[in-house]
C-alpha cells in the first residue's frame, strides 16, 4: 500500500481483528516520517499489523506485485486471505468467524490443502468515500449478508451496493453472484473462470502457493496474472456462501499514466508466458491448453517488441488500488 492509505488500513485492521501482513511503499525520508506519525496516531487499531517497508523513488510505476510478494512471504500462518486495502469485511466476516467456519467444516481445510482457493464475493458501495472520511463504522457499510441483499435491490434506482467492479465486470462475474444471493447452496460452491479477466479475492494455503509475477507494475495485468498461473498450477476455485467483502469506493485516478503503464505491461506478458511454458509446461499456443480468454493475452503479447526494461521510457506514477493484506 501507499503511505496515504493508513486510514483505510485502520478501518480494515479494526474490522478484521486478526493478524495482517502489509507491505508499504515509501518514496522519501519525509514520506517515512509522515507515515510514522500516522501509525503513532492510530496505534490502538494496528497492534496486529506487521509492516514491511519497501523503499523506492516515485519515478517508476507502482510495484504492485513486488509489494504483494513482500507481504505474502512474511505471513506466519498456514493460510492467507488476500485482498486490497480498499476492501473491508463485515463484523460477521472477521478473522475469528472464518477460523470458526473452517474449524466447524473440516472438509474446507482439506480442500485448501488440496489446491483449492476459496473466494470471498466482493461488492462495492455506490457512493464515493474519500480517504479522509473513512471510518471503522459507517452508515453505508453492509454489515450482514441480509443487508447486502437489501442494498442491492431489484430496482436500479434503489441500489446502494453493486457487484464489484462495475467498470470491469469480467473481473468478478465468474463468482456467480445469482447463486450466492440465492442462499441455496452448500457452505461453498465450485466455479470456473469462464471469461478473461477474472481476479477475485481469495483464501488459500501458504504451502506451495505461487507468488505474483514481479515484472508487472502499475495498471494492468498485475493481479490478473496470478489467477492465470493458478489455472496452470491446477488450482480449483470455490465460493464461500456466507462470506463477503466490500469495496469502499473513492474518486477514480484513471488517466494517461495508467494507459502508459498498461502498454508497458503488455510487453511483460511475453515474459510471463515464457515463464508459464517453462515452469508448468503451459502449451499456451495449443487450443487444448487454452485458459478462458487467453487469446486476448496472445494478441497483446504479439504487440510486444521484446522483453527489455521499458519502464524508464514511461511517465510513471503510483497505482492506487493494489495494496494487499494477508492473514
What are the language-model segments listed below?
Residues 226, 230:
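Short active-site alpha-helical segment characteristic of glycosyltransferases
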Residues 58-59, 63, 67-68, 72-73, ...:
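Conserved catalytic core of nucleotide-sugar-dependent glycosyltransferases
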Residues 80:
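Short aromatic/hydrophobic "clamp" motif used to bind/position activated sugar donors
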Residues 231-245:
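Catalytic donor-sugar/metal-binding loop of nucleotide-sugar-dependent glycosyltransferases
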Residues 310-327:
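Acidic, Ser/Thr-interspersed intrinsically disordered low-complexity regions
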Residues 1-59:
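N-terminal anchoring/stem segment of glycosyltransferases
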Amino acid at each position: 500500500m501507499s503511505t496515504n492509505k493508513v486510514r483505510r488500513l485502520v478501518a480494515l485492521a479494526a474490522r478484521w481483528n486478526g493478524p495482517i501482513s502489509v507491505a508499504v511503499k515509501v518514496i522519501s525520508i519525509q514520506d517515512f516520517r509522515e507515515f510514522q506519525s500516522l501509525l503513532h496516531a492510530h496505534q490502538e487499531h494496528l497492534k496486529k499489523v506487521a509492516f514491511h517497508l519497501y523503499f523506492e523513488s516515485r519515478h517508476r510505476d507502482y510495484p504492485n506485485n513486488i509489494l504483494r510478494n513482500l507481504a505474502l512471504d512474511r505471513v506466519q500462518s498456514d493460510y492467507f486471505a488476500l485482498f486490497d486495502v480498499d476492501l473491508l469485511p463485515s463484523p460477521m466476516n472477521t478473522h475469528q468467524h472464518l477460523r470458526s467456519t473452517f474449524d466447524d467444516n473440516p472438509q474446507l481445510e482439506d480442500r485448501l490443502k488440496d489446491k483449492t482457493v476459496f473466494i470471498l464475493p466482493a461488492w462495492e458501495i455506490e457512493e464515493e468515500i474519500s480517504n479522509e472520511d473513512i471510518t471503522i463504522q459507517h452508515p453505508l457499510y453492509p454489515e450482514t449478508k441480509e443487508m447486502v441483499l437489501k442494498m442491492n435491490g431489484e430496482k436500479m434506482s434503489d441500489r446502494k451496493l453493486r457487484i464489484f467492479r462495475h467498470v470491469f465486470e469480467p473481473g468478478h462475474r465468474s463468482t456467480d453472484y445469482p447463486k450466492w444471493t440465492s442462499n441455496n447452496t452448500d457452505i461453498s460452491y465450485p466455479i470456473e473462470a469462464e471469461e478473461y479477466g477474472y481476479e477475485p479475492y481469495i483464501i488459500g494455503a501458504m504451502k506451495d502457493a505461487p507468488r505474483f509475477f514481479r515484472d508487472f507494475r502499475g495498471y494492468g495485468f498485475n493481479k490478473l496474472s496470478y489467477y492465470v498461473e493458478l489455472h496452470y498450477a491446477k488450482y480449483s476455485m470455490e465460493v464461500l456462501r456466507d462470506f463477503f467483502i466490500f469495496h469502499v469506493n473513492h474518486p477514480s485516478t484513471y488517466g494517461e499514466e495508467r494507459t502508459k503503464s498498461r502498454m508497458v505491461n503488455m510487453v511483460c506478458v511475453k515474459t510471463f508466458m515464457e515463464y508459464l511454458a517453462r515452469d508448468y509446461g503451459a502449451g499456451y499456443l495449443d487450443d487444448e491448453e487454452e485458459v478462458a480468454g487467453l487469446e486476448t493475452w496472445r494478441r497483446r503479447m504479439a504487440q510486444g517488441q521484446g522483453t527489455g526494461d521499458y519502464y524508464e521510457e514511461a511517465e510513471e506514477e503510483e497505482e492506487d488500488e493494489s495494496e494487499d493484506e494477508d492473514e
